[in-house]
Design a protein with these regions (language model features):
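Non-catalytic signal-transmission and effector/linker regions of two-component phosphorelay proteins
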Residues: 1-16
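Conserved phosphotransfer microenvironments
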Residues: 27, 48-52, 61-81
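Short hydrophobic/Thr-rich beta-strand motif most characteristic of the beta2 strand and flanking loop
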Residues: 38-46, 54
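A short, hydrophobic beta-strand element within the central beta-sheet of small alpha/beta folds
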Residues: 63, 87-96
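C-terminal output/effector regions of signal-responsive regulators
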Residues: 141-204
Length: 204
């Protein structure tokens, strides 16, 4: 049934997944579950640091990390792997020790699946990990944009005699009309003002 569903699937995959697990049988189970859920396995490899190179080339949407109980060095690789990749990670393990959970949290892992694999849980777990990751990125971007938005509001308030609320509404409306992020519109406002100030007053 899995082969039939994979063969006749149309459109893009639900996600492109990297599986890092040194256990071949475990990788096979994960691959089957990913494909059954409408996903595509872009990378399969043991959980090693050199897998980062391959994953960067393929650009998965999400990576499943499966450290083995005998691989004492593998949990230590998780922070390095998650730091290098611009995608969420999900931990697949039978180890429920609190120290492992804390280590995974510090590494930025966005989801957990316990062995043995329950295939029905894989889809919702990957979807939730992606949603959490995107929200985190949105908040990080908003934090980075805030100084530029504040400066642009101040410039609009000064140049156009607007209140702070009016200046913010103007920026937001421009962002919606141009389908740009608010921070990008703010940067454009500041860049335009910088260009204007560089022009001699008599030439304006």
């Amino acid at each position: 049934m899995r082969a039939i569903r994979t063969m006749f699937r149309t459109g893009p995959p639900r996600w492109r997944v990297a599986i890092l697990d040194r256990d071949c049988s475990s990788r096979a189970l994960l691959r089957a579950a990913v494909e059954d859920a409408g996903g595509l396995v872009a990378v399969e490899a043991p959980l090693r640091l050199d897998a980062i190179v391959v994953m960067k080339e393929t650009g998965p949407d999400v990576v499943i990390l499966a450290p083995s109980l005998g691989g004492s060095h593998e949990p230590a690789l998780m922070p390095r792997i998650t730091a290098e990749l611009d995608c969420p990670a999900v931990l697949f393990t039978r180890d429920t020790d609190r120290s492992v959970v804390k280590q995974a949290n510090r590494a930025g892992v966005m989801g957990f699946m316990l062995k043995p694999l329950r295939a029905a849980e894989l889809g919702p777990t990957l979807d939730l990990a992606l949603a959490r990751f995107r929200e985190l990125r949105r908040l990080q971007q908003a934090r980075a944009d805030r100084p530029f938005v504040d400066q642009a509001k101040g410039r609009l308030m000064s140049d156009r005699q607007l209140s702070e609320a009016e200046a913010f509404r103007w920026l937001r409306r421009q962002a919606m009309d141009s389908r740009q992020r608010l921070g990008d519109v703010a940067r454009e406002v500041l860049a335009a003002e910088s260009v204007l100030q560089s022009v001699p007053e008599g030439a304006r």
